[in-house]
Amino acid sequence: WIMGHMVNSLAQIDEFVGLGSNSIETDVSFDKQANPEYTYHGVPCDCGRSCGHSTKFNDFLKGLRKATTPGDSKYHEKLILVVFDLKTGSLYDNQAYDAGTKLAKNLLQHYWNNGNNGGRAYIILSIPKLNLYKLITGFKETLKNEGHEDLLEKVGHDFSGNDDISEVQKAYNKAGVTGHVWQSDGITNCLLRGLSRVKAAVANRDSGSGIINKVYYWTVDKRSTTRDSLDAKVDGIMTNYPDITVEILNEDAYKTKFRIATYEDNPWETFKE
């Protein structure tokens, strides 16, 4: 999965998919009442990027739905996964359940079209703090209450705070999550970070007894870091330059070991070599 980083305007969906992304990451800001408000990152952000792209969240969802609905004029067949990076800094911990509820209602109406031929992409809810685990509970219970529990098959989870993996496991236990888990690791492209925690996450994924199904590393812009990530056997690379990821995947060392995921690849299944 080649995950285009910080895709916060509708034009950027076309731009990043055009460069080779089959997945995008979108930042979601919340208002004081825990309503998802904008797709917006803000300052500071990755080096070499404009931090200010912003779209009303529901308008973004409608455009994203068009981009992932077969037959639509804006449809991109290869866009199959969307990571919502939930920027919860404006929320108190006790608003997590509310935020999950409101996020679910927004997605149900504007992305899934109330279950009537909505967008088909898989969705990852990426949460920055473990103590916001009730966001997952609120999201799941809302879809169940609205009669659309089936859509949870399309939803996965990530805690993005680079916490100790055993602590991540505990948070999922509290939230009742037993699958559909991606584990992110990374840092802004302005700084360097080693691969030791990525390797620990991959080991958990491959142990057969851990909770992790997939691992992605962010933000990977350099060719050398891309190779290091692939050598560590990650499932996803989040990048500002998807064309570089595509280029490296075509190198002799990688083209027989990796391929770009399609809609038929289940993002919640751990890959077995």
Curated annotation (Swiss-Prot):
Cell location: Secreted
EC number: 4.6.1.-
Active site residues per record: H5, H41
UniProt keyword list: Cytolysis, Dermonecrotic toxin, Disulfide bond, Hemolysis, Lipid degradation, Lipid metabolism, Lyase, Magnesium, Metal-binding, Secreted, Toxin
Family: Belongs to the arthropod phospholipase D family. Class II subfamily.
Summary of the function given for this chain in its UniProt record: Dermonecrotic toxins cleave the phosphodiester linkage between the phosphate and headgroup of certain phospholipids (sphingolipid and lysolipid substrates), forming an alcohol (often choline) and a cyclic phosphate. This toxin acts on sphingomyelin (SM). It may also act on ceramide phosphoethanolamine (CPE), lysophosphatidylcholine (LPC) and lysophosphatidylethanolamine (LPE), but not on lysophosphatidylserine (LPS), and lysophosphatidylglycerol (LPG). It acts by transphosphatidylation, releasing exclusively cyclic phosphate products as second products.
Protein name stated in the entry: Dermonecrotic toxin LvSicTox-alphaIC1aii
UniProt source species: Loxosceles variegata (Recluse spider)
